[in-house]
């Protein structure tokens, strides 16, 4: 009986620790889409929050940013609300910094374009001046990939239509972002 309780306890602990860093549609770890700035202190009570509010040294910043650090001083996430200076604002964008955070299918900040393409449905690719933005709607994510990975003839300008086949599978993610509009 004790052995069964121990195994069950280990399973529950493992499941909870996995969910703490899981990325799903409408959820990033402990944070859900409906959470507001006001709730961040209680959600991350065991972590550290650095608040870069658009004042003082950051007064010319167009956004407030909330940097979430673990107790081990590892930068985990950067959260940006829709509007500045309003604690009732929901979080609009999340930059995934730590490789602890991953999708159910194992995609994290160290993944490649090929892994994303293999494990998630890509809904669109936007060509910008220096980067590609790869959209994965089923997890509210977009991935920024440097255009330096593309063949030379596709790197310049924004008018070229970039298809999945044009992006080398070993292209690394520059940024892993979650967008909640």
Where are these regions (language model features)?
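Short helix/turn-capping signatures at newly exposed starts of structured segments
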Residues: 16-129, 137-139, 157-181
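Short, structured protein-protein interaction patches enriched in aromatics and acidic/basic residues
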Residues: 134-137, 141-146
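Serine/threonine-rich low-complexity intrinsically disordered regions
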Residues: 1-2, 24, 108, 146
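Positively charged
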Residues: 69, 144-149
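Alpha-helix boundary/capping detector
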Residues: 3, 66-67, 142-143
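Bacterial Sec-dependent N-terminal signal peptides
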Residues: 1-22
């Amino acid at each position: 009986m004790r052995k069964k309780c121990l195994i069950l306890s280990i399973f529950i602990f493992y499941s909870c620790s996995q969910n703490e860093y899981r990325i799903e549609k409408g959820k990033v770890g402990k944070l859900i889409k409906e959470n507001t700035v006001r709730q961040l202190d209680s959600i991350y009570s065991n972590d550290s929050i650095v608040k870069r509010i658009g004042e003082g040294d950051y007064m010319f910043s167009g956004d407030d940013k909330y940097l979430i650090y673990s107790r081990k001083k590892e930068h985990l996430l950067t959260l940006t609300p829709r509007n500045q200076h309003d604690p009732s604002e929901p979080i609009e964008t999340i930059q995934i910094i730590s490789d602890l955070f991953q999708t159910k299918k194992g995609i994290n900040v160290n993944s490649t374009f090929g892994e994303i393409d293999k494990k998630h449905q890509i809904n669109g690719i936007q060509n910008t001046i220096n980067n590609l933005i790869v959209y994965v709607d089923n997890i509210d994510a977009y991935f920024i990939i440097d255009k330096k990975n593309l063949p030379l003839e596709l790197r310049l300008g924004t008018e070229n239509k970039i298809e999945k086949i044009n992006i080398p599978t070993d292209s690394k993610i520059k940024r892993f972002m979650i967008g909640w509009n």
